């Protein structure tokens, strides 16, 4: 999913699956400008030009001479009116930095998740302690009373490292709020509750800090995808 009407009309899609580099990519209604293949045979990087593409549902077709074709639906959404004019944060803001795992535990039921490796242990300073998005929501009145105009959370995308994941600077799924914090919908609720208070929400997302559990680290598109040395890599 992406949006039409963006100032930058170029878009790169990363397609990942077993042997996808062996396929050819076509589309009857999307303008494909380039298709890039790297060392791993499981990736296709498809470049699109969306300059004249309207909002709607589209389709990419992957074809192989000896295998069944694959149809991939893709949605372009319409941008909200005035979205390009949103004001960001600046030097006039009072920014409150929160490490969510260490702030407040609003929902003890999500402290651990069966699919996520690192478990809570309040006695271990290197382990998770149970703070979450609900804990932040529960304390918004307190934060507002301090005069805060913007909250900057350290990353909240899933970090499935087996230990030390509380700081969240090693994303394993950049599209999923870590389920020990809540859900994507709960993050939207946090944003909505802050908007009622005229407060801004800053999302911290570091694109070169990925977990060993991220699929692009487990299966590198190319050897030079990340810096690699004899030690500390």
Which residues does each PLM region occupy?
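A structural motif
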Residues: 13-15, 60, 98
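Beta-strand/beta-sandwich contexts
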Residues: 1-21, 78
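Low-complexity, Pro/Ser/Thr- and charge-rich linker/hinge segments at domain boundaries
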Residues: 3, 76-97, 102, 106
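Substrate-binding/active-site clefts of carbohydrate-active enzymes
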Residues: 103-149, 153-233
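Short amphipathic beta-strand and strand-loop transition segments with alternating hydrophobic
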Residues: 3, 33-38
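Surface-exposed loop and edge beta-strand positions of immunoglobulin-like domains
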Residues: 16-18, 49-51, 154
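Extended acidic/polar, glycine-enriched regions
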Residues: 39-88
């Amino acid at each position: 999913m992406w949006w039409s009407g963006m100032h930058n009309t170029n878009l790169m899609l990363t397609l990942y699956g077993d042997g996808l580099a062996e396929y050819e990519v076509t589309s009857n209604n999307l303008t494909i400008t380039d298709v890039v293949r790297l060392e791993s045979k499981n990736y296709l990087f498809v470049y699109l030009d969306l300059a004249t593409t309207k909002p709607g549902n589209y389709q990419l077709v992957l074809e192989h001479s000896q295998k069944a074709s694959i149809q991939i639906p893709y949605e372009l959404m319409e941008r909200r009116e005035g979205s390009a004019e949103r004001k960001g944060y600046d030097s006039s803001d009072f920014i409150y930095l929160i490490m969510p795992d260490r702030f407040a535990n609003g929902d003890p039921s999500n402290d651990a998740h069966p699919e996520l490796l690192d478990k809570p242990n309040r006695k271990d300073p290197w382990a998770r302690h149970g703070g979450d998005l609900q804990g932040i929501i529960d304390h918004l009145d307190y934060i507002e009373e301090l005069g805060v105009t913007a909250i900057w959370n350290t990353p909240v995308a899933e970090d499935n490292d087996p230990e030390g994941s509380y700081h969240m600077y090693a994303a394993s799924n950049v599209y999923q709020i870590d389920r020990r914090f809540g859900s994507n919908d709960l993050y939207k609720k946090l944003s909505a509750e802050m908007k009622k208070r005229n407060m801004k929400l800053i999302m911290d997302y570091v694109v070169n800090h990925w977990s060993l559990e991220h699929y692009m680290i487990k299966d590198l598109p190319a050897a030079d995808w990340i810096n690699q040395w004899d030690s500390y890599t």
